[in-house]
Amino acid sequence: MAKKNSVFSRRLERHLDELKWLYQELYHDEHSFSYFLEMLERSWGERKRPLRDQDARREADPDWYRRRDLLGMMLYVDAFAGNLKGVKGRLPYLQECGVNYLHLMPLLQSPKGRSDGGYAVSDFRTVQPELGSMEDLEDLADACRKAGISLCLDFVMNHTSEDHAWAQKARAGEPGYRERYFFYDSWDIPREFEKTVPQVFPTTAPGSFTQLDNGQIVMTNFYPYQWDLNYANPMVFNDMTEHLLFLANRGLDVIRLDAIPYIWKELGTNCRNLPQVHTLARMLRMVCEIVCPSVLLLGEVVMEPAKVAPYFGTPEKPECHMLYNVTTMATTWHTLATGDASLLKRQMEAVCALPKDFLFLNYLRCHDDIGWGLDYPWLQERFHIFEVAHKKYLNDWFTSRWPGSPARGELYNDAPRLGDARLCGTTASLCGVEAADFEGDPFKLERAVSCDVTLHAWMLSQSGIPVIYSGDEVGRFNDYTYHDDPDRREDSRYLHRGAFQWGLAELRREPGTYQEKLFQGLRRLETLRAGEPCFDAGADVRVEDSGDSRVLALCRRSGDRELVCLFNFSSQFVHAGVDRAGGYTELMYGTKYDSIRSIELWPNGFAWLLRDEGAQEA
């Protein structure tokens, strides 16, 4: 062990009792735990001086990632700049965008044609060759650190590619490797699993198991080439934790734990959100606090709010530092399609009731599809809206099948028998910018751009870290060329994963273009957010009655400052507001109001209203 009183020993001592208790609760294996501790110390010893210095700074400032000026962007390395060196060369553009949190989509080695967009990893310590090398990743991380940009990377925990060395050895029958996965010699147990385990991809990859050429059966909850890891085996947890720390030591600031609710399997359950998952998440949090305390864990939990919040853990025993605000994202698009903010109001009331320590990543679009995980029992009780029919309406609206819809999207995993499908498309295309530009209609284009900016204003109004999907800052449209790619044509998510069009992005500098209007609109919003204390993570936030179901009203307070945010989700002019007297100033355009009980909002428009200094609250 490290010498007495060393930094490592001090951190380990703080967590050792709980860490050992949880580890032995799962594994009852002293030898594996001893190896685990040795691995942690070895990983700490391999951490270079600049990272250890950053660890010390962030330990002294544990809320560093809760600043209101944090702005994220997620992107694919190849689509954005070709390779990692190209991304490094484009850091000035990211700084122009105001980005100081950069999430690189999966870039570790994965087989061509069987990669699931990089989520089928065949080597956790090798970068996909066409994207660069591990040295290039470390060089980019160093450059980001100097530029004040935190770097995030995905860590695929639930499964490996069938081409991973462990999987190849398991297939060949090498001792100790079948036990790293879920192998069976007959369908008896797999059929029992499938009685209770929901299918992830019922259309494109039905079932949860795959039979190999040699007759063996292996668990594959996602795609047949992604073999689920068995975390009941302590060597799997030990080795995957070591891989995570290897990546952390390359200079990453945030590690996204992909599909974390799925990582523990138990016969007779749905194999989702089991108690052991939280034990593993808690141990990973302690591992980071011991070895690399400047590194944050971002949990990918794409589920309803009641199942998301537990992944924060508790103040005494935290798990993930941050989680995605998935339900609010999906509810936002529902609200745009219906023109009614009632469900979004209910959703935000639930979010506002959570402890302020809980930090969400807020977003409109990402690399993935939009799944319609809404509060259907409430919709049915309140509006007699039924799940299957409503999902069809939403998908029809956003794929332009509904009369009058300006949206241009495509369906993903369409399952007519189940009455279910998910949605793909960029923000600009779903807001109608693509259709209006194609039609050459300046009036429609102005409305669509306004809608796009309003949705971003809504995202920026929420507590947490706002994250933009690369290209949205300049109104990137859908990329339909994936239809011509045999490796991608079956996956409509590539509709919004196309190459960044640098030529069109240059139009952000030309006044009057929609690219310039979107880019400058978003930069103005981001600058206002960074400078206004009401957007602090610790601000008091509540939803208020706007007097109109089409308009959502959000009130943020910090000290004696108050900001009222109004959002019109309908395509009509609306008069709405909150019960306030006294002077208010609209931050985006500078309009002054003596009262905001009823102000005019443009179709799909918004207002950020700051109470004037000295004005009295009604």
Q: Which residues fall in each region the model found?
A:
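Active-site and adjacent substrate-binding regions of carbohydrate-active enzymes
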Residues: M1-G583, L587-A618
